[in-house]
């Protein structure tokens, strides 16, 4: 990653305003000498958050008068928020001035403005939110995580193609794909799931492995798991909630008495790396796959460490040229007519 990468950041997005975004950006450029960041937002508010030790030669502020609120409808943001921090951060990518954009703001607006400014890759109807999730065998790609609450079989099929392309970039030479369903039997699922399975199964360029159930999501049985945005977002939020409950309950039990604290001290060499593996901040940052540019969605409630991880995902995907690789992969398959088996 020696080539300079320019990242744009919607500094006004997220639940906590610019402070955490700016803190994360300053920390990130200190660790990555090939990165410069443009923080987009209210200049006075953003500038006041920049720590005195920050490298100002690689950390810039671009003023934007408006903010896309979490309550804004995507259509409203498209019509009335053209001078917002989100719009201007995405515009930098569209103009070729930045290689990636990171925002913790309104997901629907981010997708709508992203589609308007960056456009979608040929052969893709709508982008999907995708991210790597930890599994028993390393990691898998899960999509869609909330960009499209309802999907046609053709769109779900396209998600599978994009997820497969992303998995290849992450080192899976022949990634396997499955649909998230209410059962693993071939007869399970509604008409949309059944029709999607038919499309995937008939595609010689896709290593389709049928269905996976929710309890197998983290097994690592397949490399790519596809679902609509409603199901994907619920699955992700439930997973986050379970993780918080388990770790919270474990902490409370460890603190109950001398014996528990002693056992915790003895088990620390095992518990510490185990807990580290499943920290939410470690997996923050999901890509809007299908756009002609790298756009990373950070969790709105992420802390500075989590936002810094989203910046790393942006750097990683910009350096790897993810959109171009997915576009080339899709073009090759579409050019071959997506041969059937």
Curated annotation (Swiss-Prot):
<comment type="subunit">
    <text>Homodimer. Probably interacts with PlsY.</text>
</comment>
<keyword id="KW-0444">Lipid biosynthesis</keyword>
<comment type="pathway">
    <text>Lipid metabolism; phospholipid metabolism.</text>
</comment>
<protein>
    <recommendedName>
        <fullName>Phosphate acyltransferase</fullName>
        <ecNumber>2.3.1.274</ecNumber>
    </recommendedName>
</protein>
<dbReference type="InterPro" id="IPR003664">
    <property type="entry name" value="FA_synthesis"/>
</dbReference>
<dbReference type="GO" id="GO:0043811">
    <property type="term" value="F:phosphate:acyl-[acyl carrier protein] acyltransferase activity"/>
</dbReference>
<keyword id="KW-1208">Phospholipid metabolism</keyword>
<dbReference type="Pfam" id="PF02504">
    <property type="entry name" value="FA_synthesis"/>
</dbReference>
<comment type="function">
    <text>Catalyzes the reversible formation of acyl-phosphate (acyl-PO(4)) from acyl-[acyl-carrier-protein] (acyl-ACP). This enzyme utilizes acyl-ACP as fatty acyl donor, but not acyl-CoA.</text>
</comment>
<dbReference type="GO" id="GO:0005737">
    <property type="term" value="C:cytoplasm"/>
</dbReference>
<keyword id="KW-0808">Transferase</keyword>
<keyword id="KW-0443">Lipid metabolism</keyword>
<dbReference type="GO" id="GO:0008654">
    <property type="term" value="P:phospholipid biosynthetic process"/>
</dbReference>
<comment type="similarity">
    <text>Belongs to the PlsX family.</text>
</comment>
<keyword id="KW-0594">Phospholipid biosynthesis</keyword>
<dbReference type="InterPro" id="IPR012281">
    <property type="entry name" value="Phospholipid_synth_PlsX-like"/>
</dbReference>
<keyword id="KW-0963">Cytoplasm</keyword>
<dbReference type="GO" id="GO:0006633">
    <property type="term" value="P:fatty acid biosynthetic process"/>
</dbReference>
């Amino acid at each position: 990653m020696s080539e300079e990468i320019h990242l744009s950041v919607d500094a006004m997005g997220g639940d906590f305003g610019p402070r955490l975004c700016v803190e994360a950006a300053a920390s990130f450029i200190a660790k990555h000498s090939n990165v410069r960041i443009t923080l987009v937002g209210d200049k006075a508010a953003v500038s006041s958050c920049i720590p005195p030790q920050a490298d100002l030669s690689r950390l810039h502020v671009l003023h934007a008068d408006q903010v896309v609120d979490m309550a804004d409808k995507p259509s409203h943001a498209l019509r009335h928020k053209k001078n917002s921090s989100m719009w201007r951060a995405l515009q930098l990518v569209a103009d070729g001035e930045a290689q990636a954009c990171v925002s913790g703001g309104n997901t629907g607006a981010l997708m709508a403005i992203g589609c308007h400014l960056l456009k979608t890759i040929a052969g893709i109807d709508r982008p999907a939110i995708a991210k790597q999730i930890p599994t028993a065998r390393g990691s898998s790609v899960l999509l869609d995580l909330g960009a499209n609450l309802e999907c046609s079989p053709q769109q779900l099929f396209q998600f599978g193609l994009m997820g497969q392309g992303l998995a290849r970039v992450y080192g899976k030479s022949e990634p396997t794909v499955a649909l998230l369903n209410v059962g693993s039997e071939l007869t399970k699922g509604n008409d949309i799931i059944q029709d999607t399975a038919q499309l995937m199964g008939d595609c010689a360029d896709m290593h389709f492995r049928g269905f996976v159930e929710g309890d197998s999501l983290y097994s690592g049985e397949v490399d790519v798991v596809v679902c609509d945005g409603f199901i994907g977002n619920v699955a992700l939020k439930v997973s986050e909630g379970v993780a918080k409950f388990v770790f919270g309950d474990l902490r409370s039990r460890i603190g109950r008495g001398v014996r528990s604290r002693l056992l915790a001290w003895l088990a620390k060499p095992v518990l510490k790396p185990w807990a580290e593996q499943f920290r939410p901040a470690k997996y923050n940052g999901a890509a809007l796959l299908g756009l002609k540019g790298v756009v990373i969605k950070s969790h709105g409630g992420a802390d500075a460490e989590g936002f810094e991880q989203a910046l790393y995902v942006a750097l990683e995907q910009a350096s790897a040229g993810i959109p171009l690789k997915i576009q080339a992969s899709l073009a090759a398959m579409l050019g071959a007519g997506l041969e059937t088996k």
